[in-house]
Regions:
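Hydrophobic beta-strand core residues of beta-sandwich domains
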Residues: 61, 100, 131, 138-139, ...
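Hydrophobic beta-strand segments of well-ordered beta-sheets in folded domains
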Residues: 65-66, 135-136, 155-156
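Extracellular beta-strand-rich solenoid/capping regions of secreted or surface-exposed proteins
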Residues: 98-100, 144-155, 164-180
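A residue-level signal for beta-strand positions that form part of recognition/binding surfaces
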Residues: 105, 136, 176
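Extracellular beta-strand-rich, repetitive "passenger/adhesive" scaffolds
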Residues: 111, 135, 139-142, 159-163, ...
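An acidic-aromatic substrate-binding cleft motif
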Residues: 123-141, 145, 149
Length: 185
């Protein structure tokens, strides 16, 4: 699988398989709210019965590459949101195909909005940072239990491709901070 370095310690989706240009892309599963309205209560976490498993994948944009999504379920409807992107899926059996024309983020809803697939199509870029710089909070490939990451003015959090960071970024009364990289927070 393309993206194997990013799946350390994470479960793959049971609902979707994704290929881009004929190459497999790792599809993660994540627990999300099953309700369209969320509450903004600091410290509040939904009870487990108010959540469901969604899927997501991330890959670099390459012009002209076909995205192929396969699911075990019979596809009765398929919507790609936001609709403004104009991505028109072609459905054949249990497979969905389309071409993405630029880097973007969107959701593929099969048979309704529950258990959706979130796709993150990244610009192809190489980020250069000095990992030894004291102003860089660097997280390399692998799983990191970071807890609270306190960021001061003029500092950068760099989450490298293949990194999975469990934590929260905290920054108060600061300026010129950046959170960059292709990893997962």
């Amino acid at each position: 699988d393309k993206g194997d370095s990013g799946n350390i310690g994470e479960l793959s989706s049971e609902n979707f398989k994704v290929e881009v240009g004929g190459e497999s892309v790792f599809v993660y599963q994540a627990r999300v709210s099953k309700y369209p309205i969320n509450q903004n209560w600091p410290g509040y976490q939904r009870p487990l019965e108010q959540t469901e498993i969604a899927s997501f994948a991330s890959f670099d944009y390459e012009a002209g590459k076909t995205v192929r999504i396969t699911t075990e379920q019979k596809i009765e409807s398929c919507d790609i949101r936001p609709k403004e992107f104009g991505i028109i899926p072609e459905v054949k059996g249990n497979t969905i195909e389309f071409v993405v024309t630029n880097p973007c983020q969107f959701v593929v809803e099969v048979n309704g909005h529950h258990k959706a697939l979130h796709l993150f199509v990244n610009p192809k870029e190489q980020i250069q940072v000095d990992k030894e710089d004291s102003r860089i909070h660097y997280y390399g490939p692998g799983v990191h239990e970071a807890g609270v990451i306190n960021v001061k003015s003029d500092e950068t959090v760099y989450i490298d491709e293949g990194a999975i960071v469990y934590g929260v970024i905290r920054s108060e009364n600061t300026s010129n901070i950046k959170v960059i990289g292709k990893g997962i927070l």
